């Protein structure tokens, strides 16, 4: 597969992932807004806690494998004239590595659930069906890990379309089961003689509905991927869905289960992800330690709304970029290097322009939009000020995502290890900064956001330095700083629009002010599109050519 073909598939894949995320968020939003009429806040709290357990087990079981298997290229130890054998060997390597999450996840899930079960408030433990709910959660985790070999195979073939479809179907199944159980109980549609109307029974049913929804999600996902396997792989029997010894093409007497280079990479990535997870979840630990319950609610609100743009836009782009670079730069020829740099530069420019729009129009419009979305009860000064500061944080989040995605895709084991040590230092810096800003300077939620900005800045500097060094060492003719002249020219127009925005509107408090600010945003967007019209025309032409080729 050529570099252009890989780029076309990953670009289309990013679109599929965004559409899948959008569908999932809409369905989940509708479900939550329906169920909130029937459930108490503490039930949402315990389900969020169970969700955290599921996410933690799955993250530590499979995330490092998903990143490591992206580096499995066809035929690393094969001759060039044995394409079919080479493909089969690579597929079995993928399957073997995808069995590791199950070996990690079974003991990890049992240990974590057993530990947390004893720490859960006794009230929840005595609720009806609670033990069955926990068991259903555990079975759902195991089913997701059983599905991992099929997921990794689709990832190997850049099959984003299937993934987006299957995850959307699974999310729908989750929501339908969850809603059906709660609604059936509330309307007394089933087993009315067995159920009672007590609040405890209602809460037990709600937790059971959540657990059965998770189980339905995992089972549906597994069935979809297995159907894909039956349709596309089983008849050819190129590999087995179990741990198998693989013969080395260099020496047929030698066999292995796991390729040594990928295994070493997995170990170092796993070590790094532990610190990355600490930084990702660290803000929750900090705010629970230093902030009041009201402040925790404010930050939870900001995180939930702020994560929408992260999950809908940034996350699909980062995942597609990781896979693109891992495949594209498995062979560092000049053509692939130039293509990878071009993709990175275009993405960086896109994020720069997006950051301009967010930084100029986010702080003065966000508080008005937030009040419009969730009502006036959140209209305290602390909330309105915090959402403005959070808008400044979003660009740092975006750049860190793509730069660390690049590093994760091309870094050697030793470079990943050094990055892990750097992440450890960032963790300590984050803790110290949070204490200073929250406790000493009394900045509350704003202090936590500022600490996150400093943390992201350090990580961006490290990753960007790695990228510049990477291309310099490979003696590429172009510079990573190329083609940013249009952005520099746009900065002048952006500064003028920003001044007009603050002079004419300031902090938006009415619909007329919002329309004026939106008009200025459209003017700046038009300037950006005009300045970058050559790049946009090139992308459109390439997309049309790819579509004609696929017809």
From Swiss-Prot:
GO biological process, one term: dolichol-linked oligosaccharide biosynthetic process
TM spans (from-to): 16-36, 40-60, 95-115, 123-143, 168-185, 204-224, 343-363, 391-411, 421-441, 448-468, 489-509, 510-530
UniProt-listed Pfam families: Rft-1 (PF04506)
Disulfide bonds: none
Domain of life: Eukaryota
Entry keywords, A to Z: Endoplasmic reticulum, Membrane, Sugar transport, Transmembrane, Transmembrane helix, Transport
InterPro entries: RFT1
Keyword set includes Transmembrane: yes
Pathway(s) it belongs to: Protein modification; protein glycosylation
Family: Belongs to the RFT1 family.
Primary role: Intramembrane glycolipid transporter that operates in the biosynthetic pathway of dolichol-linked oligosaccharides, the glycan precursors employed in protein asparagine (N)-glycosylation. The sequential addition of sugars to dolichol pyrophosphate produces dolichol-linked oligosaccharides containing fourteen sugars, including two GlcNAcs, nine mannoses and three glucoses. Once assembled, the oligosaccharide is transferred from the lipid to nascent proteins by oligosaccharyltransferases.
Protein name: Man(5)GlcNAc(2)-PP-dolichol translocation protein RFT1
Organism of origin: Candida glabrata (strain ATCC 2001 / BCRC 20586 / JCM 3761 / NBRC 0622 / NRRL Y-65 / CBS 138)
């Amino acid at each position: 597969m050529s570099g252009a073909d890989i780029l076309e598939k990953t670009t289309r894949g990013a679109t599929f992932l965004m559409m899948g995320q959008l569908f999932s968020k809409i369905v989940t939003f509708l479900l939550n807004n329906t169920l909130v009429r029937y459930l108490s806040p503490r039930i949402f709290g315990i389900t969020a806690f169970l969700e955290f357990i599921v996410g933690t087990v799955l993250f530590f079981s499979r995330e490092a494998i998903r990143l490591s298997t992206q580096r499995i290229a066809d035929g690393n130890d094969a001759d060039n004239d044995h394409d079919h054998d080479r493909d089969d060997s690579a597929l079995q390597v993928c399957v073997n590595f995808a069995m590791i999450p199950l070996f990690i996840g079974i003991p990890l899930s049992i240990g974590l659930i057993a530990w947390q079960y004893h720490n859960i408030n006794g009230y929840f433990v005595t609720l009806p069906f609670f033990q069955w709910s926990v068991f259903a959660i555990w079975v759902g985790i195991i089913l997701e890990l059983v599905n991992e070999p099929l997921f990794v195979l689709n990832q190997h073939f850049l099959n984003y379309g299937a993934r987006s479809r299957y995850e959307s179907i699974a999310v729908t199944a989750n929501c339908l089961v969850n809603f059906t159980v709660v609604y059936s109980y509330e309307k007394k549609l089933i087993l009315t003689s067995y159920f009672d109307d007590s609040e405890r029974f209602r809460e037990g049913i709600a937790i059971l509905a959540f657990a059965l929804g998770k189980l339905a999600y995992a089972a549906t996902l597994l069935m979809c991927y297995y159907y894909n396997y039956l349709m596309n792989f089983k008849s050819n029997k190129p590999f087995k869905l179990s741990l198998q010894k693989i013969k080395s093409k260099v020496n047929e007497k030698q066999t292995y289960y796991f390729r040594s280079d990928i295994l070493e990479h997995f170990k170092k990535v796993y070590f790094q992800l532990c610190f990355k997870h600490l930084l990702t979840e660290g803000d929750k630990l900090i705010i629970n330690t230093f902030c009041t319950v009201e402040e925790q609610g404010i930050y939870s609100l900001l995180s939930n709304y702020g994560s929408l743009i992260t999950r809908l836009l940034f996350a699909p782009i980062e995942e597609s970029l990781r896979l693109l670079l891992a495949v594209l730069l498995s062979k560092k020829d000049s053509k692939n290097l130039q293509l990878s740099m071009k993709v990175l530069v275009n993405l960086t420019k896109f994020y720069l322009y997006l950051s301009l729009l967010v930084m100029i129009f986010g702080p003065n419009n966000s508080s008005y939009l937030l009040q419009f979305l969730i009502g006036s009860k959140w209209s305290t000064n602390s909330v309105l000020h915090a959402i403005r500061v959070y808008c400044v944080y979003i660009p740092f989040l975006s750049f860190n995502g793509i730069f660390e995605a690049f590093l994760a895709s091309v870094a050697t084991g030793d470079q990943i290890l050094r990055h892990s040590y750097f992440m450890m230092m960032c963790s300590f810096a984050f803790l110290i900064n949070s204490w200073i800003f929250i406790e000493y300077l009394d900045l509350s939620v704003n202090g936590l956001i500022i600490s996150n900005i400093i943390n992201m800045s350090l990580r961006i500097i490290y990753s960007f330095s790695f990228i510049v060094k990477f291309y310099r060492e490979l003696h590429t003719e172009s510079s990573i700083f190329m083609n940013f002249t249009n952005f520099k020219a746009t900065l002048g127009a952006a500064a003028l629009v920003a001044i007009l925005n603050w002079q004419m509107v300031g902090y938006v408090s009415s619909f007329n002010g919002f329309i004026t600010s939106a008009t200025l945003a459209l003017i700046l967007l038009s300037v950006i599109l005009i300045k970058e019209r050559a790049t946009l025309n090139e992308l459109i032409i390439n997309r049309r050519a790819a579509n004609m080729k696929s017809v």
